[in-house]
Amino acid sequence: MKLQNSRLSHRFNIIWLLLCLLLSSSITIAGEWEQVTTALQDGKANAVRNLSNQERTILQATVALKIDKPDQALMLLASAKHAKDPLVDLLEAEAHRQQAIHAMKQAGGMERQEKLLASADLNDGLGEADARLRAFMDRLNKQEGDPVDILMAGPNVASVFMFDKARNRMFVYEPTRNGGLKQITDEYVVTGTVIGDKQRRGDGRTPHGVYRFVKKLQGKNLESRYGPVAFPIDYPNELDAFHKKDGSGIWLHGYPLDVSRRPPQDTRGCFSLSNDRLLTMARYVKLRHSWVIVGENFVFDHSNRKSKLLSSVKRDIEAWRRDWVSLDTEAYLSHYHRKFRSGKRDLAAWKRYKRRVNANKSFVKVGFTNMTLIHDPNTWPEGEVVVAEFDQSYRSSNYADKERKRVYLARANADQSWKILLEESLKQ
């Protein structure tokens, strides 16, 4: 009997704990919506002042629908109907759906019809409203700080475009003269119809990684469905090719000329902005000097995480350079990853090549300048990856040259040193 009572008491405690957790979660969510509603109504927060009247109304109506107040949503949307906005029409349809469900519940005896209405899925169309609301809430509770992944922007970096697929947001930054970063924009962007990292041609996914804009398409070179202008990126890059990812034609482009709204996942793998915003942002694109970072849930902070990461990368690059000029070939080769490739050479071929070359030298001098360091926000099979690009000056007892170089450094965890996974010389 005591054992049975103990078990019953234990079950009761678990049920009570679950109820408390559910109650506390619902209170937190209710408080969150109340904060958003208040901010949108009083208009004092910077996140609200930067909104157009139309966007503000759409956000207010979206919140009203989230808290099951369709009548309030319809009142708000009535003031936005003049703009002929398809997103307003979709929100209005959702409000009428909620109203109909409420009416059937009050009438009673219509469970089957109520279930049919409840199962009607408007999420594809309303995805843009949800994404915009999430972005607004992020800005309302803004986490201060720079993006961790832009470790160091060299003097030849014009801008960095960051595409956060999880948030459907595009952040754009410009380097400042004092080595900092200035945020140019934070806005809604459309990505591929299929969730996840691109692997194959035609899979509908947007690739994860670090890229550059390399071309500009417009006029007769661009179909009208892509908007007024498009900027292809250099996908697939060396890291993609190393992992046998294929496909091509990943662009930043606009909307079809007769479209003003698009759901969050609605392209064949590209990034898409509304045409007016695309034209505004086009002035910040400088081919081969505008970097592109694609990932999910970027981290922004003022903590020492970024400085620690930067220090570790700079330390290991300098150790590589130092061992190179020492002509201690084995120490120099210890900085290369076991999966290393450069062109057609794997690590074994690279070792044979470098041992042969260094055997005929009495001195080597190497310098790195104009360096850019970008941390890839995505985890690769080799672990964490950083892309380093720099001008390399090389002089030895029998050879000298200068070239632009890009290396991909990898480490399995934070306790390990960075190793060179890929090394390539770039065309000037």
Identify the role of each PLM range.
Residues 15-25:
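Bacterial N-terminal signal peptides
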Residues 32-129:
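Alpha-helical protein-protein interaction scaffolds
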Residues 95, 215-318:
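Exported/periplasmic cell-wall-interacting domains
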Residues 138-250, 256, 260:
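Gly/Pro-biased beta-strand-loop elements
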Residues 309-328, 335:
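Short, aromatic-enriched amphipathic alpha-helices that serve as compact interaction elements
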Residues 333-345:
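Short, solvent-exposed secondary-structure junction/capping segments
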Residues 355-406:
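Surface-exposed, charged secondary-structure patches
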Residues 399-428:
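Short beta-strand edge/turn micro-motifs at domain boundaries
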